[in-house]
A protein has these predicted regions:
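Conserved ATP-binding/catalytic core of the eukaryotic-like protein kinase fold
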Residues: 1-126
């Protein structure tokens, strides 16, 4: 982990999570594969971009995460943990091995209609 954000996140959360590698990065957040040191399991650790965290604010972020924490549905990934450490706002979900829908579409192109319909229905149910 050579980039400054990864090093900062790793230092801020070192007592609870060991960051293994970056899984992805978008406009709002960076997602890392990490080891939950308390429960000895692989997790996906999502960290809000610092500039977004500054605008959103810790209290609002924690309120919104508390709402998300009570959602239960087979097609919604559950929340394991969340918090603020220094200026790092984060939440933790199970790490699910496999490819994303985006990766699948890049690899294979358009989905067969029946499969696209099934996926769309599952997303809508969530």
């Amino acid at each position: 982990m050579s980039d400054p954000l990864s090093q900062h996140v790793s230092a801020c959360l070192a007592d609870r999570y060991a960051i293994e590698r970056e899984l992805g990065r978008g406009g709002m957040a960076t997602v890392y594969l990490a080891t939950d040191l308390r429960h000895h399991r692989s997790v996906a650790l999502k960290v809000l971009r610092p500039e977004l965290a500054a605008v959103l604010g810790t209290q609002r972020f924690l309120r919104e995460i508390s709402v998300a924490a009570v959602l239960t549905h087979p097609h919604i990934v559950p929340l394991h943990d969340s918090g603020a450490a220094a200026d790092v706002l984060f939440y933790v979900m199970p790490f699910i091995e496999g490819e994303s829908l985006r990766q699948r579409l890049i690899r294979d192109g358009a989905l067969p209609p029946a499969e696209a319909t099934r996926i769309g229905r599952e997303v809508a149910e969530a």
